[in-house]
């Protein structure tokens, strides 16, 4: 029924394909077609699967313990693709709670919170030439366009596109964003997180479904088609990935089975400044959960690179050096980068890290964290400060544009102007520049040339 080697590596914190064990999978059991549901809930007294196929529990479907390792499973006959479901647990305290499947491939459109049965197999890719020639771009131009697929452009009723504010679908974006990215000379499109998230305003940085491409823009195979189209136009796709924390919404990972499966047992370590919950990456099963998520998107969606959000919070507890190194999370990063360099050697691994921790892009074998690139956040902040100043006073602050060279060769850096610098009223790049509009235009031109030639 299950691959015992995968189960062993799952509990050992080294599993790259935990999604083959857990979640909802079509199978034929004793001549009957249906779906096998499996979940990891070590603290639950009992577990059920509830959904459209059993009237949300009116006909109970109690799951069986597979072993003593906290795994529950059940085969349910007659379940169809797109059927909605959840797992129902009796907690150690005797409460009954319903949870979305952490390993679900597809989710109900918000504000709904159920998981959906989905068949990931069958999409025919047309990007074999792209994949064959793909590299990590160490010795060729790398020009990345960062965008949220939801906020980049929305439909307008006045133009006959749909309701005002309605999102474009993955397929519709093929004819919208890809021509723009290509025309502007970008080599890669970096999409802000696509893993399922409940609140539009988070832009995807507070996730619930780490295997579920958000249903806001369509179905998983439509996302595959979008990425396939990017590749056929010579555009790589980088995906923002959020390994540090997750939302505390009641249907999600927080206190998944009534206990702390994914979160810290220690209250003082548990909650983040973003009103979310930190992953406890000292737990092997959590390591396997996130390792497998990255591998899943690389395999099934042909993602060309991952930009890892808030790496400083993985290096130090809460991103604070005074709180000490987050040993569990750093071990996870080393395992991740080591595994990915072996199994997906041309996929870029990019750290968004604001610390001065050494060796972020040094190979794991040389006692580094193993990333391919690190965002140079210090360069971005210093450069923008310099260009905001009146030119009369810049002679006194030349260190803003020279200091970066003092550390530039210590890591393999990417220079960036990210969404963090233009949100919450911080102004667009052009409006950060000194002077009147004509002055600002000239400054922006100088800024981008400086960035390219740095």
How would you label these PLM feature ranges?
Residues 58-70, 382:
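Short, acidic Ser/Thr/Gly-rich low-complexity loop/linker segments typical of extracellular
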Residues 1-32, 36, 66-146, 151-165, ...:
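The feature marks proteins involved in alpha-glucan
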Residues 111, 304, 316-454:
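Conserved alpha/beta catalytic core and glycan-binding cleft of carbohydrate-active enzymes
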């Amino acid at each position: 029924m299950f691959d015992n080697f995968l189960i062993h590596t799952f509990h050992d914190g080294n599993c790259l394909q935990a999604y083959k064990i857990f979640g909802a999978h079509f199978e034929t059991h004793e001549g009957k077609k249906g779906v096998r549901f499996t979940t990891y809930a070590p603290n639950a007294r009992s577990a059920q699967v509830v959904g459209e196929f059993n009237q949300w529990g009116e006909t109970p479907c109690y799951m069986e313990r597979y072993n003593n390792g906290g795994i529950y499973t059940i085969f349910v006959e007659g379940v169809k693709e797109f059927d909605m479901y959840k797992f129902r647990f009796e907690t150690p305290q005797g409460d009954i709670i319903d949870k979305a499947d952490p390993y679900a491939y597809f989710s109900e459109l918000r504000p709904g919170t159920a998981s959906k049965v989905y068949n990931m197999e069958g999409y025919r890719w047309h990007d074999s030439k792209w994949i064959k020639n793909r590299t990590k771009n160490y010795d060729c131009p790398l020009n990345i366009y960062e965008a949220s697929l939801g906020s980049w452009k929305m439909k307008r009723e006045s133009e006959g596109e749909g309701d005002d504010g309605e999102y474009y679908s993955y397929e519709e974006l093929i004819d919208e964003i890809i021509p723009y990215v290509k025309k502007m000379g970008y080599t890669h499109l970096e999409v802000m997180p696509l893993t399922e998230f409940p609140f539009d305003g988070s832009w995807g940085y507070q996730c619930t479904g780490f295997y579920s491409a958000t249903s806001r823009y369509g179905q998983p195979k439509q996302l595959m088609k979008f990425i396939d189209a990017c590749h056929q136009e010579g555009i790589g796709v980088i995906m923002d990935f959020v390994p540090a924390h997750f939302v505390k919404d009641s249907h999600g990972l927080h206190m998944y089975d009534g206990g702390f499966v994914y979160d810290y047992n220690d209250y003082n370590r548990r909650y983040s400044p973003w009103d979310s919950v930190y992953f406890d990456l000292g737990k092997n099963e959590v390591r396997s959960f996130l390792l497998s998520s990255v591998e899943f998107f690389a395999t099934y969606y042909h993602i060309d690179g991952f930009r890892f959000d808030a790496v400083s919070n993985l290096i130090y507890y809460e991103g604070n050096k005074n709180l000490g190194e987050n040993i569990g999370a750093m071990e996870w990063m080393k395992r991740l980068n080591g595994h990915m360099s072996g199994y997906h050697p041309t996929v870029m691994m990019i750290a968004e890290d604001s610390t001065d921790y050494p060796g972020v892009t040094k190979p794991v074998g040389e006692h580094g964290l193993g990333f391919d690139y690190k965002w140079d956040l210090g360069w971005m902040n210093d450069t923008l400060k310099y260009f905001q100043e009146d030119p009369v006073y810049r002679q006194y602050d030349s260190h803003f544009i020279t200091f970066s060279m003092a550390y530039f060769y210590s890591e393999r850096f990417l220079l960036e102007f990210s969404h963090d610098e233009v949100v919450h009223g911080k102004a667009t790049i052009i409006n950060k520049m000194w002077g009147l509009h004509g002055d600002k235009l000239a400054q922006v031109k100088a800024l981008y040339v400086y960035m390219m030639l740095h």
